[in-house]
Design a protein with these regions (language model features):
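Small/aliphatic-rich secondary-structure junction motif
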Residues: 1-52, 59-68
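Short secondary-structure boundary segments
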Residues: 35-36, 97-99, 128-129
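Charged helix-capping and loop-helix junction motifs
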Residues: 48-53, 84, 108-113
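Structural beta-alpha unit
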Residues: 62-94, 132
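Glycine-rich, Arg-bearing micro-motifs that act as flexible, cationic patches
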Residues: 96-115, 119
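Short, flexible loop segments at boundaries between secondary-structure elements
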Residues: 122-132
Length: 132
C-alpha cells in the first residue's frame, strides 16, 4: 500500500507534498511522488529540474519516509501518470494540490485534478497552498 502525490514545483505542489508526507507518517506506508512532463521538460515549469529533484530527495530522506520518486517524460498526461502510479503501487490515497482557474481555463485546458478525482479507485485528498 502507498500514498501517491502528484507533485509540481509550486506552492500547490509543496502543499500536496506536505499533506502526503503527514499521511504517510500516520499510515506507516510508502510515499510515491509523481512528477511528469508530456513534452519538453526544459520549458515545462511543472517538471522538476535536477536541483529541485535533489532538494526533494533530501527533504524526503531527512523525514525518514520510505519513498519512490517517479520523474518521467512520457506521452501520457499527468492524470494518466498519477492514476497509473496509484494502480501500480496499490495506493490507498492520492494527494493533489489545487490552484484557482477561471471557468474558461478549465474548459480549454482540462483539469488533471478533475480527471484524477473522477477516475481514481481510491480516495483523493485535494489541498490548496496556504494563503500568505
Amino acid at each position: 500500500m502507498s500514498v501517491v502525490v502528484g507533485y509540481v514545483p509550486s506552492p500547490e505542489g509543496e502543499a500536496a507534498l506536505e499533506h502526503a508526507m503527514r499521511e504517510v507518517a500516520q499510515r506507516a506506508t510508502r510515499l510515491v511522488v509523481v512528477n511528469t512532463s508530456r513534452g519538453d521538460a526544459l520549458v515545462d515549469q511543472r517538471y522538476a529540474q535536477p536541483d529541485q529533484v535533489r532538494t526533494l530527495e533530501e527533504k524526503l530522506d531527512a523525514a525518514g519516509l520510505e519513498h519512490v520518486l517517479q520523474h518521467t517524460i512520457r506521452g501520457r498526461d499527468a492524470a494518466e501518470e498519477i492514476l497509473a502510479a496509484a494502480a501500480e503501487h496499490r495506493a490507498e490515497l492520492i494527494v493533489l494540490g489545487l490552484r484557482r482557474r477561471t471557468p474558461v481555463g478549465k474548459l480549454i485546458m482540462g483539469s488533471t485534478a478533475q480527471r484524477v478525482l473522477l477516475d481514481a479507485l481510491c480516495p483523493v485528498l485535494a489541498v490548496k497552498a496556504p494563503t500568505s
